[in-house]
């Protein structure tokens, strides 16, 4: 697909006007593999509020004709919740040294257009510009390779992440509960963290 999208960067309190759009997008995209999330826009908006409260956070938004078609988030790990900080602390990495990349969500019709690279480029540049982080990091959902719900044509992001310099960190795993389609609340492993020197 040819896309006439634009990329916008919003920092700290500039994020606030976009919370509802990004919350709705997250609910829509996270219904699919691998999240299978039975989402709630109000919960998502509250979750994203941590980004609006962080003076050094960033939203990278992909837009087409004024509509948000993709979003990628980041904030200093020290500004995130204990659940996100704990694996780093346990792994002897000071949260003050980490700029944490939240999720990237993109409508399926716009995948393969280079937007994922733009999301990483802008978040990495934002973290570097802040000048105080040794690491950029994120996590992703781990599902069993033989999970019968995995789409036959699913292609993971591991190769993309490795090409960008991110590595799994064995032993650094967090557990996050969320409501899964048809299952209710389920405790999920959010995989070994991926880290890269900033």
Walk through the language-model features, giving the residues of each.
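A short beta-loop-alpha structural element at the N-terminal edge
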Residues: 6-22
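Alpha-helical elements of Rossmann-like donor-binding domains used by nucleotide-donor carbohydrate transfer enzymes
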Residues: 21-25, 46-47, 118, 122, ...
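Helix-loop element at the rim of GNAT/NAT acetyltransferase active sites that forms part
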Residues: 24-39
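Active-site rim helix/loop that mediates acceptor-substrate recognition in acyltransferases
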Residues: 35-64, 73
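Conserved acetyl-CoA-binding loop-helix of GNAT-fold acetyltransferases
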Residues: 106, 112-128
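C-terminal "cap" of GNAT-fold acetyltransferases
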Residues: 153-159, 164-198
């Amino acid at each position: 697909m040819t896309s006439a999208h634009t990329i916008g960067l919003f920092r700290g309190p500039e994020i606030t006007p976009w919370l509802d759009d990004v919350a709705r997008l997250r609910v829509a995209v996270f219904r699919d593999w691998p999240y299978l999330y039975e989402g709630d826009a109000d919960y998502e908006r509250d979750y994203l509020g941590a980004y609006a409260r962080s003076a050094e956070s960033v939203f990278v938004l992909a837009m087409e004709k004024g509509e948000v078609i993709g979003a990628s988030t980041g904030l200093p790990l020290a500004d995130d919740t204990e659940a996100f900080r704990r694996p780093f602390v346990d792994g002897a990495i000071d949260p003050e040294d980490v700029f944490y990349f939240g999720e990237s969500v993109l409508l399926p019709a716009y995948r393969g257009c280079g937007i994922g690279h733009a999301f990483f480029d802008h978040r990495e540049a934002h973290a570097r510009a802040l000048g105080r982080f040794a690491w950029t990091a994120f996590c992703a959902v781990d599902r069993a390779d033989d999970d019968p719900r995995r789409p036959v044509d699913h292609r993971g992001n591991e190769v993309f992440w490795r090409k960008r310099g991110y590595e799994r960190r064995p032993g650094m795993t967090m557990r996050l509960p969320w409501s899964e389609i048809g299952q209710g609340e389920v405790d999920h492993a959010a995989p070994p963290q991926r880290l890269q020197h900033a």
